[in-house]
From Swiss-Prot:
Catalysis performed (reactions): 4-CDP-2-C-methyl-D-erythritol 2-phosphate = 2-C-methyl-D-erythritol 2,4-cyclic diphosphate + CMP
Residues of the site described as Transition state stabilizer: 36, 135
Top EC class of this enzyme: lyase
Protein name: 2-C-methyl-D-erythritol 2,4-cyclodiphosphate synthase
NCBIfam families, alphabetized: ispF
Length: 162
């Protein structure tokens, strides 16, 4: 077994700055997150957790933001590619727990679809995926509505043992 932790944060752009995509779900909101890819903090944190657990570096190593090929990239595709690397190393997902930290918008209505997307991309049961959201009670940059942060913890199991 191996445990990995991931973290990601992006700041909001101006009003009308583009879609807000979290957990592979387009969430209605007046601002999008600024990023080289689609800015999906949940999938970026999950990808980092997976790569870290397998000692494969991080999302920036595998998908550098200096590479124009990843400009505007769909983070679900990045997650699937990272998971292929995990499988190739002889591991599979045990479980994934994600915490989205945002004052707004409310994530609760979108969490079921996020779980569906993650289970599909990681070839697992929805029971292996947990997504939750919290605020910082209006403290810090997330509390002021300047951006969204996310943490993820993953357990990988050896394919031969799992």
């Amino acid at each position: 077994m191996r445990i990995g932790h991931g973290f990601d944060v992006h700041k909001f752009g101006e009003n009308g700055s583009g879609p807000l995509i979290i957990g592979g779900v387009r969430i209605p909101y007046e601002k999008g997150l600024l990023a080289h890819s689609d800015g999906d903090v949940a999938l970026h944190a999950a990808t980092d957790a997976l790569l870290g657990a397998a000692a494969l570096g991080d999302i920036g190593k595998l998908f550098p933001d200096t590479d124009p090929a990843f400009k505007g990239a769909d983070s679900r595709g990045l997650l699937r590619e990272a998971y292929r690397c995990i499988l190739a190393k002889g591991y599979k997902l045990g479980n994934l727990d994600i915490t989205i930290i945002a004052q707004a918008p409310k994530m609760a209505p979108h969490i079921p679809q996020m779980r569906v997307n993650l289970a599909e991309d990681l070839q697992c049961h929805m029971d292996d995926i947990n997504v939750k959201a919290t605020t910082t009670e209006q403290l810090g940059f997330t509390g002021r509505g300047e951006g969204i942060a996310c943490e993820a913890v993953v357990l990988l199991v050896n394919v031969e043992q799992g």
